[in-house]
Amino acid sequence: KRHRVMKKHNKIIIAVPRGRILSELRIFFKKIKLNPDKSLFDESCRKLRFKSSDPSIDFIKVRAFDVCTFVAFGAAHIGIAGSDVIEEFDYSEIYSPIKLNIGKCHLSVAALKSLLVKEKPKSWSNIRVATKYPNLTKKHFAKRGIQVETIKLNGSMELAPALKMCRRIVDLVSTGKTLKENGLIEVEKIFNVTSKLIVNRSALKTNLEINKIIKKFLN
C-alpha cells in the first residue's frame, strides 16, 4: 500500500511565480531543454498545474510570495523564488543552491521628498514603514538601532505615504520611476534581489532525480 501511495506522487513538482518574470523563465527553460506546456505562460489561463516536455515533471503557477511556502511544506519539490521572498520567510526547510540572474532589482527604503527636506535619515529613531516585507524591514532598522512599526501591505505601497498612513516605505525598486511619480525618493538600498532555484531539503535527500534537475540549471 505504501509503495502505491509513493507511486501516485512520483512526479516532481516545480513551482513558478506569476507575473513578468515568466517571460524571462520561458527563455531560461528553453535553454535547459525543460519546456512547460505553453499555457503556463498565458496570463489569461486560469489553470494552476501544467505538464511539461518531461513526463516526470509538472509545473504549478502560484503567487510570487507563495512559492517558498509551497516548497517548504513539500507541496512542490523545486521552485523559482526571488531572494527577497526567500529572506523574508527564511524557512529552514528551503535550500537555495543556484542564482539564476533573472528578475533583477533591489530592495530599498524610500521616503517622501517633503520629509527629506526637513530631516536626514540619520536622525530617524522611531518610525512607521509600509512594506510587504515586515521581517526584513525590522531586521534592517534594528541593525541601525531604529525602532520601527510596520504596516503590512501587499501592493500599491507608494499610496501609503501619499495618504498619510506613514512617510516611509520598504519595497522593490527596478527603475525608480514609480517612486518618483509618487513623490518618493530612494534613501537606501537594503540588498540586491535576483531569482534563485529553491529546493525542499527533505525531497533533495530522498529523490535522486532532483539532483539531475539541479544539474540542468547549473548548465
Where do the PLM segments sit?
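Short, Lys/Arg-enriched N-terminal segments with co-localized hydrophobic residues
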Residues: 1-5
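Domain-level signature for soluble enzymes in the chorismate/prephenate branch of the shikimate pathway
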Residues: 6-219
